């Protein structure tokens, strides 16, 4: 690359801005055609994708990447299937662009409503997880946004292989290549440039480690949609159904350890602890989960449960480690979650309707659940299509960010020669 990183990123930004204007007026059928063609291209390129991904995995192992990071990096056949299905599902979703709602007449006689429009250009910065390339590209494309994707250097070969499939889909639909651009340099200066171009980029969505997201939040000159941690809780209430409690608490922790919606702390009402914790502990031990608990938990489950420290309650492990606390009741559970949680996803297991309603109302998180695993906190599971990320902010989007989260609204006004007096 002969041009400087800043010049290169500025060129990507200019091209994305121009493409965003074309995308904003693209027909739904044209956008869907690009998505379906990209899905077909992925399906046909499975061998190429696997080969590129193996290059990244081999380099990651050689560089000592942690198991959780390698898990996120891997493009298994099932994950390739999920990417293809994600593209096809997004193609079936209703197109929000151009939708006009809340039309009403006001006393002056004019008619006012709101029209849904694209944000413009979305910058995505992410580590590992090459599937994010597809998730982000599909949602941005369907919502009429151009996107600039800056993946981690550890996934460079995987991302480039995926990008070729996306470009094929764009070409077949007659859409500009700059609608989806993957940053091809691994120079870290590209991140600084991308988050400092408000003239070209309308919003940044970072997905990665806490350090990366904190840096972007601190330095960005562009609005950021983000979450820092996934410290998710399951609270087993005294009125819980034992079978449901065991099934959900098992799945929330052990279905996968790396995702941000995995349970990291289990809270159990003291009145049900003796019945539910021993069978749960057996399941966790059989699956190799390290248990850490407060004094009451250790007294109940035995000395092999490590002492939980104050830091444990604030930690997103992304690993087979679980903190357990026995609490006096719902008030203590809510207080613990609102003190130590990350406002991501928290669940209560209970058959008591009033307890469930209190939990939903008082836990300050983006997703709050009753009798369901925290692992459901996902755009695909919510019917949004593939998500672009999860936001724990309260502006502009909150929770899994799908198509609607990538749009804004503008007022539209109809008159008949009306003038203000």
Curated annotation (Swiss-Prot):
Cite the annotated pathway: Amino-acid biosynthesis; L-proline biosynthesis; L-glutamate 5-semialdehyde from L-glutamate: step 2/2
Reactions mediated catalytically: L-glutamate 5-semialdehyde + phosphate + NADP(+) = L-glutamyl 5-phosphate + NADPH + H(+)
Tell me its EC number(s), please: 1.2.1.41
Give the keywords, sorted.
Amino-acid biosynthesis, Cytoplasm, NADP, Oxidoreductase, Proline biosynthesis
Under the heading InterPro entries, the entry gives: Ald_DH/histidinol_DH, Ald_DH_C, Ald_DH_N, Aldehyde_DH_dom, G-glutamylP_reductase_CS, Glu-5-SA_DH, GPR_dom
Biological process terms in GO annotation: L-proline biosynthetic process
Keyword Cytoplasm listed? The answer is yes
Q: Which domain of life is it from?
A: Bacteria
**Molecular function (Gene Ontology), one example:** NADP binding
Q: What are the GO cellular component annotations? A: cytoplasm
Under NCBIfam families, the record lists: PRK00197.1 (NF001221), proA (TIGR00407)
Q: Which family does it belong to?
A: Belongs to the gamma-glutamyl phosphate reductase family.
Q: What does this protein do?
A: Catalyzes the NADPH-dependent reduction of L-glutamate 5-phosphate into L-glutamate 5-semialdehyde and phosphate. The product spontaneously undergoes cyclization to form 1-pyrroline-5-carboxylate.
**What protein name is recorded for this chain?**
Gamma-glutamyl phosphate reductase
